[in-house]
Amino acid sequence: MTVTKANPGSLAVGTPFNYAFTVTNAASAFGPATSVTIKDLVPAGISITGVPSGANVSSATCTPNTFPFMGNGTAILSCTVNFTAAVAAGGNTSFNLPAVPTAVGSSTNTASYDPSGGISPVNPTAGCTTDCASTPVTPVTPG
């Protein structure tokens, strides 16, 4: 299993956006993927505003489960996303994590995942490259 992550890039402070996650089940997978757990290292200046959602999301839970979840560069949000339809070997699905920039400045948001589909990914770090998905974001002053 692999997970990738994207966002709109440069956006105005206070403007809601989604981190878009794509989950791909390996063609060599032993079976379908029914869920994924991500741990998201939320940077300073970003606030997560709710649980993940998407067309193939049957339910999602996060720890802590208090929103908005204010990033500070060390705070980790752990979310388990359950899929409505299992993702077959070689298939993929996507979901969104809603957020809003709260301060001007560039940052990188990194999330980790368990490539075997387990529920205990390692805690992500700023330079994580193995079993992690990262995307830069640049909040700017509105106007």
Q: Which residues does each predicted region cover?
A:
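Exported/extracytosolic protein signature
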Residues: 1-143
